[in-house]
Amino acid sequence: MAKKCFCISGKIFALNLFGKRYSKKIIKKRDLKKYRLYLHPAVAVDGIIEKDNKILLIKRKNNPFKGCFALPGGFVECGETVEEAVVREIKEETGLIPKVKSLLGVYSSPDRDPRGHVISIVFILDVIGGELKAGDDAKEAEFFDLNNLPKLAFDHEKIIKDYMRWKNG
C-alpha cells in the first residue's frame, strides 16, 4: 500500500516529498539521497448525500467488502484536492453531480481498512445534477432509509452515526 516512489527510465519519479507537491517531477537517483522518504497512509474521501431522510449508498463491486454497501468514495489522486476527489468519486460511482456542503470529519484509525492505513475525509454534499446510476466500481447505487440501513463496509456505520449527531445537532 505504501509507495514512496517508482522508476521511470532509470530515474526516480517522486510523488510527494516533505508534504510539498512535486507532481511529475523527475529526480535523479543520486539526488534522492538529499531527501528522507517516509511511508505514508493513503488518503481517501467519502461522501454523504441525504434526500428525504434517506442516505445514498453504493454496493461495492470489488474487494474489500465486495457485495457490501458503503458510502460513495475512493482514493484521492495526485494533483487533486480532497474536495475535487469526493466530487469525482461520487460522479463516477453514482452518476450524480454533487457540490460540497460541509466537512463532517476525518477518520484515521489505522485498522479501518484491511488494505492498510487509510485516512478518510468525509464530506456532506448536495446534489446539483446528474441521474442516479451505478458506475465505476459500484454495482448498485440507491438511497436507504436512515433508520433501516444494510450492513455497511469499513467504519461507515460509525460515520453515519456521527452524521446523525451532526444533523440533529
From Swiss-Prot:
Its EC number is 3.6.1.13. Mg(2+) 3 binds at residues 89, 93, 142. GO terms for molecular function: ADP-ribose diphosphatase activity; metal ion binding. Residues 38-168 form the Nudix hydrolase domain. The active site is at 140 (proton acceptor). Mg(2+) 2 binds at residue 89. Mg(2+) 1 binds at residues 73, 93. This is ADP-ribose pyrophosphatase. It comes from Methanocaldococcus jannaschii (strain ATCC 43067 / DSM 2661 / JAL-1 / JCM 10045 / NBRC 100440). The lineage of its organism: Archaea, Methanobacteriati, Methanobacteriota, Methanomada group, Methanococci.
